[in-house]
Amino acid sequence: MSPREQQLRQRLEARFAPTLLTIEDESHLHAGHAGAAGGHSHFRVTIVSEAFRGVSAVARHRLVYAAVDDLLKTDIHALAIEASPP
């Protein structure tokens, strides 16, 4: 697990106490892409949390982005999100 993936996991676990959290590093799919410089920059997150109950899909994405905002500005180029309540 890369340091970026560890940071991402720690942030999401602390903020959402998920019942399910999977993080896939998809950086290898973007080799040669300008945003892929340095590797470990493209991630797919699947997260299930009670915090998402009654929250629209757009709002769930905003919550996830807010939890990792500083990482998106510096280390993570792309984040695909599947967020849902249990």
Enumerate the language-model features and the residues they cover.
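C-terminal structural segments of small proteins and small subunits
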Residues: R53-P86
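Absolute protein N-terminus
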Residues: M1-S2, P86
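A short, structured beta-strand/loop element
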Residues: A31-S49
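Solvent-exposed beta-strand sheet faces enriched in polar/charged residues
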Residues: E24, T46-V48, E82-S84
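N-terminal first-folded block
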Residues: S2-A36
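Conserved beta-strand core positions
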Residues: T19-L21, F43, L79
